């Protein structure tokens, strides 16, 4: 693996998971990197739902999807990720990805929050089919990042081990609160 950024690390697992025809969710659309990857992997027969509360994220993602010639299998939603269960059925989703924090290049005062992110993860876990994958990139710092990190880690640690496998990784030798990669597999 040449690119050692957390997003590339997580996309390695996403590539192993998503097959043509799958239903996928990008819970935090951002600049559209994961949305584009999910769209390409799911292919013409697949479906991708992407959520963000910032219009700027939606516009950046539209541009990215067009630039990458992604199949038109996506729905970009200007809505909170905690409402994803309105758009997908229980145990139908193969992969859900989250990048918690703020929009890169955007307003740092607008960021994900622990309460809505935990509700979104809870909702997403119900949507995942057996064998489905949820990825979380937990960025800390900023005004609410430490609180979100701590509350999210406490939440995922209490998930039923008979229903979910939670793999928590860390950058052991990186300074300044490096992001935390988390994989959750529905058993």
Task: Specify the residue positions occupied by each region the protein language model found.
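S-adenosyl-L-methionine
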Residues: 1-22, 36, 40, 58-91
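Helix-to-beta-strand junctions that scaffold the AdoMet/dcAdoMet cofactor pocket
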Residues: 19, 42-43, 128-130
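Conserved SAM-binding motif I beta-strand of class I
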Residues: 47-52
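Conserved SAM-binding loop of SAM-dependent methyltransferases across substrates and taxa
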Residues: 31-45
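Mobile active-site "lid"/loop adjacent to the S-adenosyl-L-methionine
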Residues: 98-120
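Conserved beta-strand signature within the Rossmann-like core of class I S-adenosyl-L-methionine
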Residues: 28, 120, 127, 131-138
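Class I S-adenosyl-L-methionine
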Residues: 148-187
């Amino acid at each position: 693996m040449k690119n050692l950024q957390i997003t590339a690390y997580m996309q390695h697992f996403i590539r192993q998971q998503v097959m043509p025809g799958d239903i996928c969710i990008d819970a935090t659309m951002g600049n559209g990197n994961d949305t584009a990857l999910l769209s390409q992997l799911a292919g013409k027969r697949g479906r991708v739902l992407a959520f963000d509360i910032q219009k700027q994220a939606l516009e950046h993602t539209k541009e990215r999807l067009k630039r990458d010639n992604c199949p038109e299998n996506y729905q970009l939603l200007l809505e909170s990720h905690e409402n994803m269960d309105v758009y997908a059925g229980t145990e139908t989703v193969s992969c859900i990805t989250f990048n918690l924090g703020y929009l890169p290049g955007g307003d740092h005062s607008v960021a994900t929050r622990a309460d809505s992110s935990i509700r979104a993860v809870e909702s997403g876990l119900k949507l995942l089919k057996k064998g489905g994958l949820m990825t979380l990139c937990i960025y800390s710092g900023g005004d609410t990042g430490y609180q979100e990190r701590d509350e999210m880690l406490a939440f995922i640690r209490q998930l039923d081990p008979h229903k979910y496998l939670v793999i928590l990784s860390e950058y052991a030798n990186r300074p300044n609160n490096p992001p935390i990669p988390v994989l959750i597999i529905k058993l």
